[in-house]
Design a protein with these regions (language model features):
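Glycine-/small-residue-enriched transmembrane alpha-helix faces in small-molecule transporters
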Residues: 1-41, 148-175, 195, 199, ...
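Juxtamembrane helix-entry segments on the extracytoplasmic side of multipass membrane proteins
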Residues: 3-8, 32-36, 40, 62-68, ...
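Hydrophobic transmembrane alpha-helices of multi-pass small-molecule transport proteins
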Residues: 50, 71, 123-142, 197, ...
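Specific transmembrane alpha-helical segments of multi-pass solute transporters/efflux pumps
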Residues: 17, 21-22, 51-101, 137, ...
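Transmembrane alpha-helices of multi-pass small-molecule transport proteins
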Residues: 30-80, 107, 165-172, 186-205, ...
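Helix-helix packing/entry segments at the starts of transmembrane helices
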Residues: 11, 38-41, 78, 82, ...
């Protein structure tokens, strides 16, 4: 099977997990575990899982020159990104958060322009403006209070920060993904994430009544650790070996659709006019940013028939 197709399938799988996670993780906060405590649970669980399966893979030495990039990638991907996402989700709603994270491909493009010196077209500038307009609409005009969403504007703002950090993570980790085995990277990045999150999260983590948790909380925590953290990061890293960060970012299109369907079915959120407008602005912006120029598309088609 074509490696690129498998990479796109992996990116789709990771995005589908993230889409479900907006509602699944939302339900357990703060009733069973605080936002910071959940982050520590994620990185601890993923560390154990990656080191566990690491025994079945050949050991790989990491070059000393790459540790700086690994540290930065871990900081943005396993600490800042997770803290902002979980805290933002605890304050906002599943649909709001899923719409805002679709800014990721726009942010990845901006970072690519800065670090890779890529050219940016007027169409992409318009797309960036539309995307941020959608995010600002949610931040400024979202309802000020909803059940289990005590501070929606602040939560939405934190989700924008999350999208930025995840974009930085994708750009920073791409060269590493091409050089090292996926398990090798995850084995070292998640323990770094544990050390970074420990001072912030240990208090809430220790307050959890682990023996008294109902099944409703246990399976949701298990989903967040096993699927949202272990499998999602594994799938994204696999995809990065074959496709650029901007391509993976495009798959965040699907997160709002998946989140809206699941949240509506479970009664955890509902769509309204403001959210619809914001979604249209964000989708329109991301589409303009990520759409290939006609010249490139025509060249690709011509190459297919040669």
């Amino acid at each position: 099977m074509d490696k690129r197709f498998l990479a796109l399938l992996a990116a789709f799988g990771a995005t589908s997990i993230y889409g479900l996670n907006h509602t699944i993780a939302k339900v357990i906060m703060p009733f069973y575990i605080g936002a910071n405590g959940l982050v520590l649970l994620r990185v601890l669980g993923a560390t154990l899982l990656f080191w566990g399966i690491g025994y079945f893979f050949p050991k790989e030495k990491v070059d000393r020159s790459d540790w700086g990039r690994i540290f930065i990638a871990a900081a943005f991907g396993m600490c800042f990104n997770m803290q902002l996402f979980i805290k933002g989700l605890s304050l906002s709603t599943p649909i709001n958060s899923s719409v805002i994270v679709t800014l990721t491909p726009v942010i990845v493009l901006i970072l690519s322009v800065i670090f890779l010196k890529e050219l940016i077209t007027p169409k992409k500038i318009i797309g960036i403006a539309l995307g941020f307009a959608g995010a600002i609409t949610l931040i400024l005009y979202g309802n000020s209070f909803t059940f289990n969403a005590p501070n929606i504007p602040l939560g939405n703002a934190l989700m924008v920060g999350n999208a930025f950090c995840f974009g930085v993570y994708l750009v920073m980790v791409k060269p590493l993904a091409l050089k090292y085995n996926t398990i090798t990277l995850m084995k070292w990045m998640f323990p770094l994430g544990v050390l970074m999150n420990l001072p912030i999260s240990i208090s809430e983590f220790s307050e959890v009544d682990w023996m008294g948790l109902p099944w409703e909380a246990v399976w949701r925590m298990g989903f967040v650790v096993l699927f949202t953290t272990f499998f999602a990061y594994l799938l994204n890293m696999f995809a990065l070996k074959e496709v650029p960060p901007t391509t993976i970012g495009v798959f965040t299109y699907l997160q709002p659709l998946i989140a809206i369907i699941y949240a509506s079915i479970t009664g955890n959120d509902q769509m309204d006019g403001i959210k619809t407008l914001a979604a249209i602005l964000v989708f329109g912006g991301v589409y303009l940013v990520t759409r290939k120029p006609k010249k490139v598309m025509s060249k690709e088609k011509k190459h297919q028939f040669q």
